[in-house]
Amino acid sequence: MINVNEFRPGITFEFENEIYVVISAQHSKQGRGQANVKAKVKNLRTGAITIKTFSGGERVEKAHIEKISMSFLYNDGVSIVLMDDSTYEQVAIENTKITWELNFLTEGIKVKLRKFNNEILDIELPAKIELKITSTFDAVRGNTTTNPTKRATLETGYEIDVPLFIKEGESVIVSTEDGKYVSRA
């Protein structure tokens, strides 16, 4: 059992016959009232992200998730295909379960497949990924008041804001948690 006061990003738990992973947790206490915990959680079966409120001290069942190292092979439009690095076994996961993760998948990238009692749930990406910029426009002179950025399209089709000095064809490091530019590769 896990006390909800110990919620941290990445903790997995069972609640109301569903399996969740904590994305973020905020603890609050009002005056004389009981403390509560607002947790932004992702349902690992459906991929839905919701906010759940728990009263302080409440306990939930820990979900023991098996993580298997795999390589991304390809996306056929309906599902992605992964290959186990040790057994060469291939596994397909529906795109509807991993809509956010699709923004960062490139051929050969290493991911972790999450399983619960032999049920395939979803994938876990590395915290930061190197991706190539396929298109961006040149900076406009004089548009440099405070921390100027411009839109850029990555090789996966995902769009991010990058600093003005980044050019088309360069590689950048992107955070997979919030989808933002981190640094030049």
UniProtKB/Swiss-Prot annotation:
Location relative to the cell: Cytoplasm
A GO MF label: translation elongation factor activity
CDD domains: S1_EF-P_repeat_1 (cd04470), S1_EF-P_repeat_2 (cd05794)
Pathway in which this enzyme or protein is active: Protein biosynthesis; polypeptide chain elongation
Role played: Involved in peptide bond synthesis. Stimulates efficient translation and peptide-bond synthesis on native or reconstituted 70S ribosomes in vitro. Probably functions indirectly by altering the affinity of the ribosome for aminoacyl-tRNA, thus increasing their reactivity as acceptors for peptidyl transferase.
NCBIfam families in the cross-refs: efp, PRK00529.1
Family: Belongs to the elongation factor P family.
Name of the protein: Elongation factor P
Gene field: efp
